[in-house]
Amino acid sequence: MTMPREDAGNVDDQDAGMRLVHLLRAVTVELDRMGERFAAAHALHPTDVRALICLLDSARTGAPATPGTLGTQLGLNSAGTTAVVDRLERLGHVRRERDTRDRRRVLLKVDESAVTLGWSFFGPLIQDIVALMGRYDTTEQATIERFLSDVHKAVTEG
């Protein structure tokens, strides 16, 4: 990673960019801490929480969730992924189902009880963020969405 050079552009723009970087880092730290509190309160490993988030995101987008895709998303090998899925299954948060189109493939489904549990903890924050977005007009919301999408792309491809 290279540091921005003083002569690489307008210093005010660099300062604004760095303020945003620091804010994003602060939000990330707080969200991580919140996830850790959720994990501790519900006898989960932080990786289990990340796995549930990945599986919920897959369900939201309609993408099939398999142990292989989950392992890739979490950066785990097959043994590590199996351990995570086994723990979540034992706790009743996830179930394995055979794919009806390809019986060789196993799909991972999040149980409704896990969704309810997540909403009970994270729901107030989600509602606050959605309400906060009401302060911005549609053009500003589109800019925020584009910015966060670009940041996500930079993080995942960087």
Residue ranges and their predicted role:
Residues G35-L76:
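N-terminal helix-turn-helix DNA-binding core of bacterial DNA-binding proteins
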Residues M1-H42:
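N-terminal leader segment of winged-helix/HTH proteins
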Residues A79:
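Key DNA-contact positions within bacterial/archaeal DNA-binding proteins
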Residues M1-N10, T139-G158:
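C-terminal regulatory/oligomerization modules of transcriptional regulators
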Residues D86-A142:
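Charged, amphipathic alpha-helical coiled-coil/dimerization segments
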